[in-house]
UniProtKB/Swiss-Prot annotation:
Homodimer. This is Putative amine oxidase [copper-containing]. The modification 2',4',5'-topaquinone is found at Y475. It comes from Margaritifera margaritifera (Freshwater pearl mussel). The lineage of its organism: Eukaryota, Metazoa, Spiralia, Lophotrochozoa, Mollusca. Coiled coil: none annotated.
Length: 781
């Protein structure tokens, strides 16, 4: 929906805010006795409607999704069933997303100086073919959009590798509940104080599953998972009961293969029941928790309240309107311009990132989030989670203004297709965009005396942030793409949410974590994040070089000691020529800078006009290569890996990663195993960040964020003749009228610091809005 044209600027402003009313944006309110906060409505150019003719990087529109559905449902050979009728042994659409044209075609279209036809749009559609023998996952490319007439098979994947989905979860939950309740109802009630069926307010539930891939079970084609039992109170992850079942799925046959209870393994539910009838059988009593605001696992305000009175916290304002625009998933901000979209499986991706209209990054995209737990009992021992298999992008929804993003941010919905809905599902508030003052400065210096001074010059650190938050079961991950005024691009990840503890026993005390209360151990786990950075510095023919900082042994001319030497550091240029040479594992004894450049372009000083990659979130994986599930995440072996870009190597992971550990659908090791030349080639940097988390009592009920943020940066390195932010109107310069006579006063040069403007910060009506529409934030049907 476009903004209506009006004669009055303030009317236009109100319409702009009305378009975003539930997002927390509102016009600024005049404070009594203060100057009115006049806003230049021209700046407020956000258009969050869907285009009739989508730009090349735009997500599939609802019209395109519906037309692809209609086309596929008419293909009788696919035997597709509609949502609601689909079962795991039928054929149904699992999801779809944009399928980008080849990069060469896209670059040609973007850079053409004459009118050029846009490459045709297409969708990649994932279909679960449970109706086939053998069952299989099929991916099809459907084109051209918006009115498809053709489709072709993209790839086939073994059915046991399929990602988790609602249809399967419902089937498994029903199977486990009936099987376990039918055999062990009395056992569960006496041991854990609750039931699986007809449980009232004392419910037990199989909330979490630890996948066991073929490389772990050494049973090709088998899809296994340990399902953990929890007491179903807020939050269930903090109420484990030391009971789990190993479920095996082959085709459409479900069996319970093992049962774990109280540090003992059993071959069946019946075996547990038989032993339980024996009076000598070790009992375990875990009382069902009393639900109250004081329950340790509950996120309810409690303890000593602060501040002393309910005084509102600080809020930022935009006194003259927004300084960025969003239209058709393209953001323009100062000298930056970029497109963004959402992959339902792998999460947020940015494209065509430009600074001063010069392409810096063709694609910046999350690839996977991995969490590897450790523990004494099987649910934690095998808890190696590849979150792509849980559909990272589908779990973006419900960011709250004033907490998750500033109140005045622009909130943006995404539309996806899920297997459980015939219509495109709207992920409300999937993204937010906002400009903020970080409270730091971009640069500053003060010189108080002659001969240089007296003067002061400084620029506040103002940035634009594109944010997405994905919630995968118990954990929440904030993913920020941060655009600095000086051409620096920052990518930041912050984990928070609930930990997955285990029941305290003597066997796991202190070995895998600390005791958090009278019944829990906070299990050690390792978070890892992988990003793709398709760097294009002055074109697609780039080099990757490390500037190695090495010891320089030189003469010591001022020393009176004969043959004395002086040690300092020097730079050694190290051009990485092949992919194997471009695998980086951090070594504290070998400091270096990582730079990317086009060798055919030099600065006036003769330097390579480069961008530097800085990884400030490095974490080493200790797992032996190819052990357990490690092979699926081969990217975690290196903090940076640089490879030659290929259309067949578009992602380092896939939604099939959880069970594909024996023969991964995407094997990242193959990206560099052929050891191709990377000199003057189109290069991709694969950046891995991570952190080890040893939970402590302050992680109850929820892990806090300070100290957990991880970032990597792309920073200009001899790319500009000087700081490109020297032109910032946000700068302040203070100097003496006469530097030899301060008594003559000072002069102040500032352009964006209004002196008499006193405004209330935007409050918005978001909370009133969700009272009437709770599905905005929660999955309520």
């Amino acid at each position: 929906m476009s903004l209506p044209k009006t004669a009055n600027g303030m009317d236009k402003l109100k319409l702009c805010y009305l378009l975003l009313f539930y997002l927390g944006s509102s016009s600024l309110t005049e404070v009594s006795g203060a100057q009115t906060c006049e806003i230049d409505s021209v700046l407020c150019t956000s258009d969050l409607s869907e285009p009739d003719d989508p730009p090349i990087f735009h997500d599939l529109t609802t019209k395109e999704i519906k037309s692809v559905q209609t086309y596929l449902y008419h293909q009788r050979d696919l035997r597709l069933l509609r949502p609601g009728l689909a079962k795991i042994n039928t054929s149904f659409i699992q999801g779809m997303e944009l399928y980008l044209p080849n990069k060469k075609d896209v670059i040609h279209y973007l850079q053409s100086k004459v009118p050029t036809p846009k490459p045709p749009r297409a969708a990649v559609v994932t279909i679960f073919r449970g109706d086939c023998d053998p069952a299989v996952v099929e991916e099809y490319i459907v084109f051209p959009l918006p009115w498809p007439t053709q489709h072709r098979l993209h790839r086939k994947v073994p059915y046991y590798l399929r990602p988790f989905n609602d249809v399967e979860f419902a089937t498994i939950s029903d199977f486990l509940t009936k099987q376990v309740d039918g055999v062990l109802r009395q056992f569960l009630e006496e041991s854990f104080g609750g039931r699986l069926i007809n449980c009232g307010n004392r419910c037990l539930n199989f909330q979490f599953a630890s996948p066991v891939g073929p490389s772990v079970s050494n049973e090709p084609g088998a899809r296994k998972s340990w399902y953990w039992l929890h007491q179903l109170v807020e939050y269930s992850a903090l109420h484990p009961v030391d009971f789990a079942v190993l479920m095996k799925i082959v085709g459409c046959v479900y069996t319970i293969e093992k049962v774990y209870f109280n540090n003992m393994y059993f071959n069946s539910l019946q075996e547990v029941a038989l032993h339980y009838r024996n009076p000598s059988f070790p009992r375990l009593r875990i009382p069902y928790p009393v639900d109250s605001k004081q329950l340790f696992s509950k996120m309810e305000r409690r303890g000593i309240l602060f501040p002393e009175k309910p005084v509102s916290p600080p809020r930022q304002v935009e006194p003259e309107g927004k300084r960025y625009s969003v239209k058709y998933q393209e953001v323009k901000y100062m000298n930056w311009k970029f497109n963004f979209r959402l992959s339902p499986g792998l999460g947020p991706r940015l494209h065509n990132i430009r600074y001063h209209d010069r392409l810096i990054v063709y694609e910046l995209a999350l690839q996977d989030i991995v969490v590897f737990y450790s523990g004494a009992e099987p649910p934690h021992q095998y808890a190696n989670f590849f979150d792509s298999s849980y559909m990272i992008g589908m779990n973006l929804q419900g960011m709250v203004p004033g907490v998750d993003c500033p109140t005045g941010a622009t909130f943006i919905d995404s539309h996806i297709l899920t297997e459980s809905s015939l219509k495109p599902a709207k992920l409300i508030n999937a993204f937010c965009v906002f400009e903020q003052n970080t409270g730091d400065f971009l640069r500053r210096h003060i010189s108080k005396t002659s001969p240089d001074g007296p003067f002061y010059e400084g620029v506040p650190s103002i940035v634009l942030v594109l944010r997405a938050i994905t919630t995968i079961a118990n954990y929440d991950y904030t993913i920020d793409f941060i655009f600095h005024h000086n051409g620096v691009l920052q990518t930041k990840v912050v984990p928070t949410g609930y930990i997955l503890p285990s029941l305290y026993t003597k066997q796991n005390e202190n070995k895998y974590g600390f005791r958090l209360n009278n019944k829990l151990i906070g299990n050690l786990h390792h978070h890892l994040f992988n990003f793709k950075v398709d760097i294009d510095i002055n074109g697609q023919h780039n080099r990757y070089e490390t500037l190695d900082i090495v010891l320089d042994k030189t003469s010591h001319p001022v020393s009176k000691k004969p043959y004395d030497v002086w040690y300092q550091n020097k730079i050694k240029h190290n051009l990485r020529k092949t992919e194997m040479e471009a695998l980086f594992k951090y070594d504290f004894d070998k400091p270096m800078h990582h730079i990317f450049y086009n060798n055919n372009l030099k600065s006036p000083e003769g330097n390579n006009m480069a961008y530097r990659l800085v990884n400030r979130g490095m974490s080493k994986s200790l797992l032996p290569e190819c052990s357990g599930n490690e092979g699926t995440g081969a990217w975690m072996r290196h903090q940076i890996a640089v490879t030659k870009r290929k259309e067949t190597e578009l992602t380092s992971s896939s939604v099939y990663s959880a069970f594909g550990t024996k023969n991964p659908v995407v094997n990242f090791r193959n990206f560099y195993a052929d050891n191709e030349n990377i000199v003057d080639e189109d290069l991709v940097a694969w950046v891995t960040m991570g952190t080890y988390h040893i939970p402590h009592t302050e992680d109850l009920p929820v892990t806090h964020t300070p100290g957990l943020d991880l970032s990597f940066f792309l920073s200009p390195f001899n790319y500009f003749p000087e700081d490109p932010a020297m032109g910032s109107r946000d700068s302040v310069r203070i100097e003496a009228v006469d530097k030899n006579n301060l008594k003559r006063g000072i002069k102040i040069d500032k352009q964006t610091f209004p002196e008499k403007m006193t405004c209330k910060a935007p409050i918005g009506n978001y909370f009133e809005y969700i009272l009437k529409r709770p599905n905005v934030i929660f999955d309520i049907q």
